[in-house]
Amino acid sequence: TLIFLIGAMITVELIDAHGGFMFITNHITTKKKKKLLALIAVITFFMSAVLDNLTTSIVMIMLIRKLLGNYKERWVFGSIIIIAANSGGAWSPIGDVTTIMLWVRGNISTSSTIPHLILPSIVSALIPVLIAMRFLHGNVTPPNAFSQMEADNELLKKLKDKEKLSILIIGVLCLLFVPVFKTVTHLPPFMGILMGVGILWFYTEMLYARKPIDEDLKLRLSKVVHRIDGATLLFFLGILLAVDALRCSGVLSDFAFWLDDTVGNVYAVNLIIGALSSIVDNVPLVAGAIGMYPVATDAMVAAATDPAYLANFMQDGVFWQFLAYCAGVGGSMLIIGSAAGVVVMGLERINFIWYLKNISLLALAGYLSGAVVYILQNLIL
């Protein structure tokens, strides 16, 4: 995961260093906070369904840095990016690590998961955005100093618009290539992202070879690597090690078995797992659930003493789909509860207590609203 994060950050930094994101920011003309927040949330939600929420968060943070100069405004927008990224990843089999796990192991399928989870996921992102918009007024504060720095960048002046656009397109395609690479080769995602870095590196070297640019101005990969945020990487490593310690000690698996024995209801178990995923990583929680419950077959359901309950554990059953939703969306309730939250916290230095006081209730409202929508869907349809 850490190597994947490094690869994603290098890719995004390469695009940004060569002015690729300027094409997007130049087309975002609105200065009103409410409209901009809604636009950022929509882009993040659907981008996260194709990319993973970690990469999406990095890309969107780089975008809002070019649009917002006030760090408190960026904290609000960054928090909504976390919520939208987690919600967007929940309804797509390739949108989050947990949905990929469930999809690859045969617990869920694309044809059933998307239509069942897209509406709850939209609601889980829409409610926090609507609440947040009520507290936003006026226009955004543009980042004057940052814009001037870009204007003074000699490299960007020497690159043509089509060359900047080509770097953006190649970079985005490299990011989109990762889930395809994993599905086709069954190799870890970090190998796909490193291959994408290699492709982008090769293209920029070819670009420099054709243009008369001073060596000092060239932003080769070796220079860009030094620009990525090392503190974010170390912070992310610390979170991963802490969660892995809980997993290795058996605390998470023991709690999963206790949940099964004590609660029993598939909706309640998943809601609790979702709440827990805001404290610890959702990957070991989902892995524990997969280990506890095998995918039920028609024969197993027919032979069961309670066939209606066991049917929830068939492929695309209620338990697995609701698990994908809860584990994905529940991580938004605390900023340390998801990979997207951890990386945004590191990049923007968002205060944990600030997020808890200002955003956690919004995320909880969205989480419960989406859960209610999913439960009602199953009761009505």
Predicted regions and their residues:
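Alpha-helical transmembrane segments
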Residues: 1-9, 112-128, 184-197, 269, ...
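Transmembrane helical segments that form the transport core of multi-pass membrane transport proteins
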Residues: 18, 40, 174, 178-315
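Membrane-interfacial helix-loop connectors
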Residues: 47-84, 88, 97, 101-117, ...
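Juxtamembrane and boundary regions of transmembrane helices in multi-pass small-molecule transporters
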Residues: 70-71, 75, 79, 91-92, ...
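Intrinsically disordered, low-complexity non-transmembrane regions of multi-pass membrane transporters
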Residues: 136-170, 201-230
